[in-house]
């Protein structure tokens, strides 16, 4: 192999695939363990630094493989400690990744696609349309970049304790790559994050949710956002294909396979005058009866292309009270990082807009020097 483009990126390979890769080189499978630790635990991307492998193997790896993460094009920390990155992937596409610190916990919100095809009416990402799925290397690369940003650090004081697949895209529409990336998150030789602390959020691709339960036992979040099909059809068009009853039945099946008594998280974006009334909350109580779950209320974050409005905090708390009194543990998501960005999906759009303007300016200057 001669071109760098032909090299295999090892960053997204879980242990089993990396072992198979080394076998094709005529090497023992334990080499995969060594490389996993170098890449993910130590943040190394240079084979020459992997000093517990022979020089000849390192030279061979440089010929056929690479360790390549996303390029950081934006990195800023808000007053409340929230840190946001825009990372450029292959083909010049960008995604955003957000780290939310909360005491001893650090939750990283990771993207699975560039854009999104679901076109949920309250989501700014969907307005950009769908471009492509991220590779496993591009997904785990977001964790890799974020972790490296804090190196060196005390192993007992890890900056990333939780990962949520809640960024741009629908994870279950990028099934294989998302599963590979989550396996790396939970791999003891890589990030060693507990399966309870890795959460996949889905709008409800029911067949893929059933398939997910056969291959992993990460925590589950359901993007519900409405207490009935009529309203959810308007907010989440996917509901027309997989209505609420089918989605909640699949959620029950998934939870029944877990080895522990874990609950699903029900995500509910609260939109003024749309789904924020006490009667909506009471309808939700009936809908979720018997489902092991907790509820996370997300006050709508306005963005330019939407006519929806953020509800008052009083309205959101009234909604919460109905659910709490019915016995559901219900929290209101705190808006973080307002001073550096607003809703998910807006930051990357603004950065790409600036990039396009810069490219147009350069092109004009080249034509008219």
UniProtKB/Swiss-Prot annotation:
It is found in: Cytoplasm. S-adenosyl-L-methionine binds at residues 169-170, 201, 223-225, 301. Binds 1 [4Fe-4S] cluster. The cluster is coordinated with 3 cysteines and an exchangeable S-adenosyl-L-methionine. The keyword Iron-sulfur applies. It is an enzyme of class 2 (transferase). Its main location: cytoplasm. Reaction proceeds by a ping-pong mechanism involving intermediate methylation of a conserved cysteine residue. Specifically methylates position 2 of adenine 2503 in 23S rRNA and position 2 of adenine 37 in tRNAs. m2A2503 modification seems to play a crucial role in the proofreading step occurring at the peptidyl transferase center and thus would serve to optimize ribosomal fidelity. This is Dual-specificity RNA methyltransferase RlmN. It comes from Marinobacter nauticus (strain ATCC 700491 / DSM 11845 / VT8) (Marinobacter aquaeolei).
């Amino acid at each position: 192999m001669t071109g760098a483009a032909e090299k295999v990126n090892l960053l997204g390979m879980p242990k089993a695939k990396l072992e198979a890769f080394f076998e094709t080189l005529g090497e023992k499978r334990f080499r995969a363990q060594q490389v996993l630790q170098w890449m993910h635990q130590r943040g190394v991307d240079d084979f020459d630094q992997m000093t517990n492998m022979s020089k000849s193997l390192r030279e061979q790896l440089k010929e056929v493989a690479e360790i390549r993460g996303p390029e950081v094009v934006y990195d800023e920390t808000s007053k409340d400690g929230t840190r946001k990155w825009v990372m450029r992937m292959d083909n010049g596409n960008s995604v955003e990744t957000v780290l939310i610190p909360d005491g001893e916990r650090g939750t990283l919100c990771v993207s699975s696609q560039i854009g999104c095809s679901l076109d949920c009416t309250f989501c700014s990402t969907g307005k950009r349309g769908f471009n492509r799925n991220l590779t496993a290397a591009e997904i785990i690369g977001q964790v890799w970049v974020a972790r490296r940003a804090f190196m060196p650090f005390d192993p007992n004081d890890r900056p990333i304790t939780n990962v949520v697949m809640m960024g741009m895209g629908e994870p279950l529409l990028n099934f294989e790559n998302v599963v590979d990336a989550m396996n790396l998150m939970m791999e003891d030789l890589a990030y060693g994050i507990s399966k309870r602390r890795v959460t996949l959020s889905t709008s409800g691709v029911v067949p893929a949710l059933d398939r997910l339960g056969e291959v992993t036992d990460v925590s589950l979040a359901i993007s519900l956002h409405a207490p009935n099909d009529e309203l959810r059809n308007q907010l989440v068009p996917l509901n027309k294909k997989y209505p609420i009853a089918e989605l909640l039945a699949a959620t029950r099946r998934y939870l029944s396979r877990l080895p522990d008594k874990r609950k699903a998280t029900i995500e509910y974006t609260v939109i003024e005058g749309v789904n924020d009334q006490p009667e909506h909350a009471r309808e939700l109580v009936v809908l979720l009866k018997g489902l092991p779950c907790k509820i996370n209320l997300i006050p709508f974050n306005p963005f330019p292309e939407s006519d929806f409005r953020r509800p008052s905090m009083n309205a959101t708390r009234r909604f919460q009270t109905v659910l709490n009194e019915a016995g559901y543990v219900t929290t209101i998501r705190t808006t973080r990082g307002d001073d550096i960005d607003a809703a998910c999906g807006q930051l990357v759009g603004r950065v790409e807009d600036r990039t396009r303007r810069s490219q147009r300016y350069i092109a004009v200057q080249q034509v008219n020097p």
